[in-house]
Amino acid sequence: MSSNSYEVSIPMSKKLNGIPETTSKDLQTLTEGAVLSFHNICYRVKVKTGFLLCRKTIEKEILANINGVMKPGLNAILGPTGGGKSSLLDILAARKDPHGLSGDVLINGAPRPANFKCNSGYVVQDDVVMGTLTVRENLQFSAALRLPTTMTSYEKNERINKVIQELGLDKVADSKVGTQFIRGVSGGERKRTSIAMELITDPSILFLDEPTTGLDSSTANAVLLLLKRMSKQGRTIIFSIHQPRYSIFKLFDSLTLLASGRLMFHGPAQEALGYFGAIGFRCEPYNNPADFFLDIINGDSSAVVLNREDIGDEANETEEPSKKDTPLIEKLAEFYVNSSFFKETKVELDKFSGDQRRKKLPSYKEVTYATSFCHQLKWISRRSFKNLLGNPQASIAQLIVTVFLGLVIGAIFYDLKNDPAGIQNRAGVLFFLTTNQCFSSVSAVELLVVEKKLFIHEYISGYYRVSSYFFGKLLSDLLPMRMLPSIIFTCITYFLLGLKPKVEAFFIMMLTLMMVAYSASSMALAIAAGQSVVSIATLLMTISFVFMMIFSGLLVNLKTVVPWLSWLQYLSIPRYGYAALQHNEFLGQNFCPGLNVTTNNTCSYAICTGEEFLTNQGIDISPWGLWKNHVALACMIVIFLTIAYLKLLFLKKFS
């Protein structure tokens, strides 16, 4: 079979209703857009296999010598699962880790700028938009952080309104996107909102990772019709897709077929059927071309069987045994390399590359920002506050539980007496207050885990700095959600329990509970940062607090702990909080009825004063004995927050 016979075209003349025909004016517009070319793209990753003692690292080839040109229009990357289409898309969008990556990606013949990922648009497969905000509020956030500060608010609002109108979101512009607790817009409208977030910057190149995933056939078709209209405005739209139906396939301008990291076809989508027909794979009538191509690649198509029967005798006579055993994918890749489509692509690639010879892709991890740190901090804090108010289930539930626990504890330990039983009751209730603050702070793990995908996408796209996001979340979520419950808990329990009737003692207790809550929450952030599953972070937090409780000072007298384990007490958050609360409450108290501490009266009780109790517990009764606990908690807050920030900063943000 000669390679020259591959150049066969089967035009797909029928078109969908509602799609305008391409006019000469459209062609002129398309030629003025951005042309992305990729030259000899190879990508390998190192994979660890085997068990712990027998683990070895092997290098796996993901993409091998991929070449092509993406022009203004709809450029589809099609292939089976694991074929490398998402990897190729991420490489073209400069969102793939450059380790193991080689080749060139050019824009109109020039290297991509270092901040290409910030100037282009990228719509991820899972729609990462804030569900508690309206469509317009999400777009306002994108415009505020991605558009230059030289633009006025009026100009930004005009851009937002234009994008809303262009994507047909007028009717739902002021509706919430929706969460699992809040009813919002439809799946198609949510996908269009994700696209609108990227169109705010008016990019010439738009990347989409499987934009039809999770949508029904009608909604998926509507999304692709929208992309088709956008492509006619001169945009280069590049997207991966798994198994489109026929009406969607007909919209494609360019088709790239990948399998096992090899290029099966790259060229005009309407000529793909003709190409495969020319090499012996005939599509049955009424079969979806996209399904037909995937069947060929997977080797389970009737066309493959017919092809093997037709060329079987010829292969037996002319081919060597090693050639007959060549896998189908290898044969298809070889067919394409010998085809006229590949030769035409090489001519275009040589025109773009010119005489420049580049060895490998540079590391495109640079991220640029259109706004300042303070501007980003303001908008992140504002969005987080709106998210808190728009999703009140968690916050209200936490406040209700706080009030309920405060009343229950107040009823159980109501009006503590200054007698020996009061010593035990005070020690018990102060221990409960401390541990309750710790375990209530476990909810802080969700602060960074739930929004991990949103954070990674927005950071790579140049919305904000890591520092802006981190401090914005602290100001809007962590501080109010830990401070308010501590204030409420103190106000309810302090007077019901009948603790020391001094103003300074009341505020010291409130401060101590806040510090314990902040320390525990900071520890939760340090553990949760970078985690993808809330349950894992919660489990680690719970185990840590259980061990900390042992060294808090109630369950075991810390003076009796063996030296080689006693150092663990200095890592216990409850220990510092519990010691501070005991110092604040017991100092100056008299627990022996009728005992005059100013005289030499004797008493039958082992402990009569608060000082004696504190000394027995190994607590320093000096003023520094109180405040050193707050200093220790403050140091732990700084250390844990630093760990959380560094984990966010060095989080693997590129796939």
UniProtKB/Swiss-Prot annotation:
It comes from Bos taurus. N-glycosylated. Glycosylation-deficient ABCG2 is normally expressed and functional. The keyword Translocase applies. It is found in: Cell membrane; Apical cell membrane; Mitochondrion membrane. SUPFAM superfamilies: P-loop containing nucleoside triphosphate hydrolases (SSF52540). Disulfide bonds join 592-608. This is Broad substrate specificity ATP-binding cassette transporter ABCG2. The chain crosses the membrane at residues 396-416, 429-449, 478-498, 507-527, 536-556, 631-651. Homodimer; disulfide-linked. The minimal functional unit is a homodimer, but the major oligomeric form in plasma membrane is a homotetramer with possibility of higher order oligomerization up to homododecamers. The keyword Glycoprotein applies. Residues 36-285 form the ABC transporter domain. Residues 1-395, 450-477, 528-535, 652-655 are cytoplasmic. Residues 389-651 form the ABC transmembrane type-2 domain. ATP binds at residues 79-86, 183-189, 210, 242. PANTHER family: ABC TRANSPORTER G FAMILY MEMBER 28, BROAD SUBSTRATE SPECIFICITY ATP-BINDING CASSETTE TRANSPORTER ABCG2. Broad substrate specificity ATP-dependent transporter of the ATP-binding cassette (ABC) family that actively extrudes a wide variety of physiological compounds, dietary toxins and xenobiotics from cells. Involved in porphyrin homeostasis, mediating the export of protoporphyrin IX (PPIX) from both mitochondria to cytosol and cytosol to extracellular space, it also functions in the cellular export of heme. Also mediates the efflux of sphingosine-1-P from cells. Acts as a urate exporter functioning in both renal and extrarenal urate excretion. One of its GO terms (biological process) is biotin transport. It catalyses: ATP + H2O + xenobioticSide 1 = ADP + phosphate + xenobioticSide 2; urate(in) + ATP + H2O = urate(out) + ADP + phosphate + H(+); indoxyl sulfate(in) + ATP + H2O = indoxyl sulfate(out) + ADP + phosphate + H(+); sphing-4-enine 1-phosphate(in) + ATP + H2O = sphing-4-enine 1-phosphate(out) + ADP + phosphate + H(+).
